[in-house]
Structure formats: C-alpha cells, structure tokens
Amino acid sequence: MTNIPIDRLSLNQMKDLIRLEKRLSQSVLGQNEAIEQLARAIRRNKAGLNRQSGPLGSFIFLGPTGVGKTELARVLAREVFGGEDSLIKIDMSEFSERHTASRLVGAPAGYVGYEDGGKLTDKVRRRPYSVVLFDEIEKAHPDVLNLLLQILEDGKLSDSHGRTVSFQQTIVILTSNVGAEQMIQDSELGFGASGQKKSASENRHEKNSRAALRELEEFLRPELIGRFDNVITFKPLSRSIVRRIFDNLTSDLVKAVARHGMTLDITSSAKRWLIDRGFDEQRGVRVLRRTIQSELADPLSDVLLSNKAKPGDTLEAKIDNDKVVINVNRA
C-alpha cells in the first residue's frame, strides 16, 4: 500500500484494505484465522465503528515462539503504512524495572537521559503512522501497563518534556508466549486435514486460547485486556506449513542463482535435512532462516565465486555425509 495517512486513502487504497487478508497471508503462512481477525478489526476501526479516541487498531498476539507473531506485525506495517520501517518494536525485557519503564516517555528532569527523549514517544512523534509492537509484554514493569492503558483510552501520551504524542494513527500490538507450552504439547505436526482431525484441532485451539487468556490475566488486568480490539492466538505450525515457509525463504536464493543464468535445484532430501535442522516445536521457524543461510547459501556462494559453474548449468543441492553439497550439472 502507501505511507499516505490512512484517513486520506483513495478509493483504490481503501480496496487494498478490503483485500488485506490476502496480502498478509501471502507472507505469513499457517495463521489464516489470526489474519482474518486482525484485518476485520482494522476495517471496523477505519469505518468508524469502534472507539474513536484510541489507536487505529490494538491487538494482543499469543502463541509459541517462531510461529509468525512478529512477522505478521512487520508485514502489517508494510501493507498498511508503506514499509517495514513503519514498525516500531519495543523489547519489554529492557523495561522490566521502574526506572527503565520511565524511559519510554523520557527520563524526568535532572536525571540521566532527560535530553534523549522517550524511547517510545520520540519514535511515534517522528513516525505517527506506524505499527507499535510491545514484544513479550509479560516481562514489562507494571508502570508500562499503565502507559498502555492511557494509550488505549486516550490515544495519546505526554513525554517528559510535556509534549503530547498522538497514537491515534498507530496500530498497537502486544506479543506474549503465555500458554505456549500447552499449545506445543497439543499440536499435531504432519497430519492431514480430514474433517475429523480438523474439528479436533479446532477444538484444541479454542481450549488452548481460553487457557492462554486465563494465564494472560495473571499479569494483565482485565480492564486493560478489555480495551484491546482482539486477543489473537496463533497456532503451532504444521509440517506442511513449514515446507511452504521453506519454499518462501529459499525463493530469493533461487532468484539470485537465476540472475547468474543458472538453475538451483534443492533435492527433497536436502529440503528435509534443512527443515529438520532449522525447525522444532519449541523454536518454530525462528532459526530456519539462519540454517538456510549457513548450510545452503554459504556452500552455494562458494561455488558461484569459484567460477566452477557457468550460465546454463544446474546447481543441485543434496546431502552427502550429513551436510549440504552443491553439484554442478552441465547444461
């Protein structure tokens, strides 16, 4: 989309909001239900059907590590505000103490850091059309939660210099891993999508969502949770979804090799080996990208830079002695 303020969007750009699910699901796989809830709430707010004083949208993302929570926030920033640089990510582990929590709006006068401004307010003041991501909210000091309540109720904060910063054109997202262990234990990786299994999976997801919400209420007050548009629970990734994510992650390598006039062929055994190395239920696909870089892209770059291959050749990635090797097959 564009970085034009969302209250000035043209008819064509408004149509992009109608197609938001499709655009998001092209980049974030396996989380269709989460994407649908997110897109519907944003459209309701844009149509003026929700609170007018708060942010454009506000959400809590629950789920295991590496299933797409942060990635969805990043893609949302790109699709709604025109670029991934419109994502403001705040790591809550850095704001777990009272004196660090105050840094979000700026240190008080006379304290170290007063001239630096607020870690949150300064960023939003410079980029008022943005997705603001509070990552791992369970690690935040309670003072941070009070600031969040003010953002959701009033749509603004005052920094330590007395300047008012508007959050009304931001999308506010909290992420949390609460309930993740139970979700992972109950997940069924690699099963088909028969009606019976799908129904059982949906029932487990609903049960785990309720359990995660109860756990969330142990550190977030119900009145704060109630201010959010949606609490969205992400599902653990199935094996079939991970294979599609692998294809997405390796597509840039395929294109890069094609620019050399060559073809990259990743054998099924190499694909399985890389997925096994880069994915597990506890970490999701968080390390899959790094695994592809170190185990596939590195030997591939060695072949390209050594002039062992020439235009028209096929570079075959396969497994030999428990590692990826690149064979050059002449045209």
Where are these regions (language model features)?
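AAA+ P-loop NTPase nucleotide-binding core of proteostasis motors
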Residues: 1-331
